[in-house]
Amino acid sequence: MKWICAAGLLAAMAATCQAPIERDMLAAHNSVRARVGVAPLVWSKELESAAREWAEKLLAGGEFAHTPNSSYGQNLFESRGRRASPAQVVENWAGEAKNYNASSNRCRGVCGHYTQIVWRATKQAGCAVAGNEQREVWVCNYDPPGNVTGQRPF
């Protein structure tokens, strides 16, 4: 059985499923942004819709890849055998902060998920999750996108 959790579906699902995800994803993102003095993000239904479509496609196809040729920034998270909370998803990405050196504006290892979260110019986010018994896929889209080569996130 497949499940999808995103706004725009049935009102009952939106009330029981999306509201907490929207609220919790935004709170988790904004908590990380506040740590470095960056303004909070606002939720975008458009970005959420695009995230939902991509999460569903990834789940159905058994894939895990960024949306090709997207004009948005994007973070992906995959969980197998357990469900993750919005806070766990964002903290997984934010954990890359240890790999980012703000003085040199360089990463030691992976840090692009973290820098996208704290990218000062990014103003909006929209996220969704799609899952089944074996796997769930989280997608967050950001606008304007971050991780512009040569620029600092904050």
Where are these regions (language model features)?
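Positively charged n-region of N-terminal signal peptides that target proteins for export
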Residues: M1-I4
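Generic marker of residues within folded, mature protein domains
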Residues: A7-L9, R23, H66, I117, ...
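Hydrophobic h-region of N-terminal signal peptides that target proteins for export
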Residues: A7-C17
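Disulfide-stabilized extracellular recognition modules
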Residues: N69-Y72, R80-F154
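Generic signal for short, ordered secondary-structure residues
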Residues: A11-A12, H29-N30, A97, R106
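Short, well-ordered surface patches within globular domains
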Residues: C17-G73
